[in-house]
């Protein structure tokens, strides 16, 4: 049976440099994390700020702290009814697939608000 691993959301530790963030997560005893760059890394205001150099520095910081990045979190709204808005949000997610690969993240996550419920006609 696989080992049970407990992780934490990175942004629950505040906004920091990658080194500071992963050191804090590791010291708190967590083996893995969900990383949402726009919520957890200083200086990242949009996904355009996540450069290949930043992704590599993030991976190195996580490795040094003994923390794996289980989820590359992209907090975008994928349930917009307006197709142009939805496409813009999907583009943000797609831009992060190469980053997830660098981070060795097992999956990518997002968050959908109750806006999705308005699309269901009961």
Report the location of each language-model feature.
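N-terminal pre-domain/capping segments
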Residues: 1-107
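Mobile beta-alpha loop/short-helix "lid" or hinge segments that flank ligand
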Residues: 103-117
């Amino acid at each position: 049976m696989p080992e049970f691993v407990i992780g934490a959301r990175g942004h629950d530790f505040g906004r920091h440099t990658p080194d500071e963030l992963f050191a804090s997560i590791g010291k708190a005893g967590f083996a893995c994390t969900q990383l949402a760059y726009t919520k957890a890394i200083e200086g990242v205001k949009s996904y355009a700020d996540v450069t290949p150099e930043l992704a590599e520095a993030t991976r190195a910081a996580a490795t040094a702290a003994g923390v794996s990045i289980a989820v590359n979190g992209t907090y975008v709204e994928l349930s917009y009814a307006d197709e142009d808005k939805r496409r813009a949000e999907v583009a943000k997610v797609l831009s992060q697939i190469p980053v997830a690969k660098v981070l060795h993240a097992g999956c990518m996550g997002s968050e959908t608000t109750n806006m999705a419920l308005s699309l269901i006609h009961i």
